[in-house]
Regions:
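Active-site-proximal alpha-helical
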Residues: 2-5, 98-99, 103-113, 121-188
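Aromatic-acidic/polar surface patches that form glycan- and anion
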Residues: 61-65, 97, 140-144, 228
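Surface-exposed helix-capping loop/turn segments at secondary-structure junctions
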Residues: 7-15, 156, 160-162, 219-221
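Juxtacatalytic substrate-recognition/specificity segment
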Residues: 1-96, 113-115, 133-135, 175
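Short amphipathic alpha-helical interaction/hinge segments
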Residues: 30, 80, 115, 119, ...
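Residue-level detector of short, conserved catalytic/binding motifs and their immediate flanks
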Residues: 17, 102, 240
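Beta/coil-rich, acidic/histidine-enriched accessory regions frequently appended to metallopeptidases
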Residues: 138-142, 165-257
Length: 257
């Protein structure tokens, strides 16, 4: 990862950056290298000041490799921001998450990602693909997936080198002027081009498909007496019951029927 990113970013670290690995996620959550608590959904962390990468082994070589690549992108982002070419960490902290996290996802999973493709298909089906400005201002749009998809489009059309140039420029002038200066287009025009490309890719797949509500009845949801998180469903042999794990009780996850 380091050699690949060093070539792409045209940037080398002046000194090695520590990578702190934990045997599993529970050990990672108990790290004393960070203040505060880490949630189960946190896959890894890169410190902004020391640029240390802190992460667990996931039990899957592929997943661990992805998290390591993702966090090393952040290490490069921080290091560039702190150098002469950047504007300090303040410039980085002003950038939207779709730009920072989306770049880390794109450069660590590549242009064709099945998970991101699933998000895009669903957004097209619901006619809810965000614009760049919506991703910047509305938290309901997950920046990792939609940001990765946008960067994949930019990388495919303009080249990955332009992604790096856009990031560097964004540190100094902000993301919107950087799009105009580096790509020669506006954020609105880029949003329209991205939407057109996504629709061309996924709209043909929507033919003959039904929305979930048209295909069956919703069984496990707050509206039916279940919780917000309901996992591991198992149907009884006679089809009358569904056993599942749910957090609908206040203090614990229990088996429900």
């Amino acid at each position: 990862w380091y050699e690949r990113f060093a070539r792409l970013f045209q940037h080398e670290f002046e000194r090695p950056k520590p990578i702190i690995l934990y045997a599993d996620h529970p050990d990672f959550q108990q790290t004393n290298t960070l203040s505060g608590q880490l949630s189960e959904g946190t896959g890894g962390v890169t410190e902004s000041l020391k640029n240390r990468v802190i992460m667990p082994l996931t039990g899957s070589y592929g997943a661990t490799d992805h998290v390591l690549g993702h966090e090393l992108v952040h290490a490069f982002q921080y290091n560039i921001a702190q150098g002469r070419a950047g504007a300090g960490l303040q410039g980085l902290m002003m950038l939207p998450l779709w730009l920072v996290e989306g770049m880390a996802e794109y450069l660590s999973v590549g242009r064709d990602d099945p998970l991101t493709a699933m998000w895009l298909r669903d957004a097209i089906r619901r006619e809810d693909l965000p614009t760049i400005k919506q991703m910047t201002t509305e938290t309901r749009f997950f920046p990792y997936r939609f940001g990765e998809a946008l960067w994949a489009f930019v990388g495919g059309k303009y080249g990955d080198e332009q992604i790096v140039d856009l990031y560097r420029r964004s540190l100094r002038v902000g993301w919107e002027p950087a799009i105009e200066q580096v790509l020669g287009t506006t954020s609105d025009s880029l949003s329209a081009e991205w939407r057109e490309a996504v629709e061309a890719e996924y709209l043909p797949l929507m033919a003959g498909r039904q929305a979930p509500g048209e295909s069956g009845a919703l069984l496990l949801a707050p509206s039916t007496g279940a919780g917000h998180q309901n996992v591991s469903p198992s149907v009884s042999p006679d089809g009358r019951w569904v056993a599942f794990l749910s957090e609908k009780d206040l203090f614990q996850v229990k088996v429900n029927f």
